Amino acid sequence: IGWAYIDQEKFCKPLYDLVDLRTRMVKRTILTTIEVLVGPIRAKNKTHLLTGYVHAAYPPVYSNLAKVAGFDTAVLVKGVEGGVSPALRGDGKVFYYSGNNELQETKFDPKSISIEQNMRAVPLPNLDKQEGVKLDEISSDINVEDFSAKTSEIGIEALNGKDGPAKDTLIYTGALTLSIIKNISFNEAASQIKKAINSGKAKDFFYNSIWIIIK
């Protein structure tokens, strides 16, 4: 088992070449929806899709596209800002299908796996604003490289077992995904995720996979 990343420029250059046009258009295009289903890396046996959505109309669209694209399972999470992690407060809504089954809806309660946070998500890093880094009127005036470095630091701390919203997000997202794909209880899935993090196994796996990819 491992993980990998292939840059769009490498696996679909014509699509990547539209980046400048899409930036100038600003608005979300249909390409933003369908490009997550390309899946340049496929498993030998089963391939699962995990993606996020915001608007209620998206789950059936993603589900139908995922089946056409050949995904054995699709897990569609109503995530914070369209990401794959649900809000840490309140029930997490998830749509999913497995095999030839129809799309189903379910909810996960973070409190049932001992996650009780007052915030919806991991707070953004507190960085000083800088002059000259804004690209336009809607972009941030935070240095992107500094932001990325601080975000990575928060993620590594979570993998090191530091309690807080980042670790809770890993547990919550991992547990709901594992419970659906492996068809086990939410609590059992959370227990496995917590054990992997607290034992250091998750961090070792993360670093070993990076080393293999770089090599």
Q: PLM ranges: what are they?
A:
Residues 2-215:
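Glycine-rich anion-binding loops and their surrounding alpha/beta cores
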